[in-house]
């Protein structure tokens, strides 16, 4: 079915203007599933489903062998959460016991790429790591569920935005590129007054300290001029994720040369092109 309907074009135009709506692609082999949470990384057919999620910091892992061990341990840890974490109702508990849904995610992916001299795109090295991630997360979770007499999980992997925890971990968030080398951050004081501070991105500073030239560090600001690279990379990583990926495609402001009424058809065709390989897509001008 041709997705290029007038309704689709209208929604694309609105997303380019305001960032709303986001898109959920539930067709083909994704027929009937729904993005189940606000960050959109969990998909399910069940209305009362829950998912035990956690993230591995790729940027701090040096070798594929270490990565395999950490993915194995992290998957077993999430399985333990299926019997320890409390849920608000019996209906939800019944669905959790039935589905045993897990969402082992990744953060620090862009830092991992930059440390190895890669651009924000799929490459053979990353493919090797993603194959380990896919295979070992399922193997470890299945083995541990069998050991604990739990149902094997309906899903294993989901990449959440990891906004706050990636700041605490000192790395890039989820799949996202570094927002900018330097930026102005605002924060609320006493719940009433906004204050501002200028900051060099901590991940960027760490990379610069390690000898990487600032001009070689791509950021979300740089990639905003080439959104297809962002969407293509999300599609390429999605091949290894059985839930979904939470990622926001940064765009120039509406009314500028790269985001305006004349670009709506181009963006609509671009989204339509990659939609079969995506579960969700969010843009923010």
Residue locations for each model-derived region?
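Function-dense linear segments that define catalytic or interfacial modules
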Residues: 12-116, 182-191, 278
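Internal maturation/activation junctions in enzymes
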Residues: 75-93, 97, 108, 113-165, ...
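General structural feature for long, well-ordered alpha-helical segments within catalytic domains
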Residues: 7, 49, 70, 74-77, ...
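Polar, glycine-rich mid-to-C-terminal structural blocks
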Residues: 1-16
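Catalytic alpha/beta core of large soluble enzyme barrels
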Residues: 35-47, 54, 78-86, 159-161, ...
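Acidic/polar loop patches that form or flank catalytic/metal-binding clefts of enzymes
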Residues: 22-24, 121-122, 283
């Amino acid at each position: 079915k041709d997705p290029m309907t007038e309704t689709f074009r209208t929604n694309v135009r609105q997303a380019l203007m305001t960032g709303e709506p986001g898109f959920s692609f539930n067709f083909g082999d994704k027929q009937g599933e729904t993005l189940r949470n606000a960050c959109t990384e969990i998909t399910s057919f069940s209305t009362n489903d829950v998912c035990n999620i956690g993230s591995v910091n790729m940027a701090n892992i040096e070798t594929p062998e270490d990565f395999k061990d950490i993915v194995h341990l992290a998957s077993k840890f999430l399985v333990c959460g299926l019997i320890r974490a409390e849920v608000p109702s019996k209906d939800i508990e019944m669905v959790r016991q039935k589905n045993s849904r897990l969402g082992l995610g990744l953060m620090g992916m862009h830092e991992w790429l930059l440390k190895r001299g890669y651009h924000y795109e799929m490459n053979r090295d990353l493919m090797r790591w993603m194959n380990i991630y896919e295979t070992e997360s399922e193997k470890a979770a299945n083995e541990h569920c069998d050991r604990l007499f739990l149902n094997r999980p309906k899903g294993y992997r989901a990449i959440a935005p990891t906004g706050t925890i990636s700041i605490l971990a000192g790395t890039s968030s989820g799949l996202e590129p570094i927002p900018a080398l330097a930026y102005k951050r605002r924060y609320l004081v006493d719940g009433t007054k906004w204050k501002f501070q200028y900051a060099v991105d901590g991940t960027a500073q760490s990379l610069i300290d390690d000898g990487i030239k600032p001009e070689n560090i791509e950021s979300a600001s740089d990639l905003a001029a080439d959104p297809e690279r962002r969407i293509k990379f999300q599609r390429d990583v999605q091949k290894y994720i059985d839930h979904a990926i939470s990622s926001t495609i940064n765009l120039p402001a509406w009314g500028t040369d790269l985001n305006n009424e004349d670009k709506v058809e181009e963006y609509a065709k671009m989204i339509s092109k990659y939609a079969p390989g995506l579960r969700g897509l969010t843009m923010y001008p």
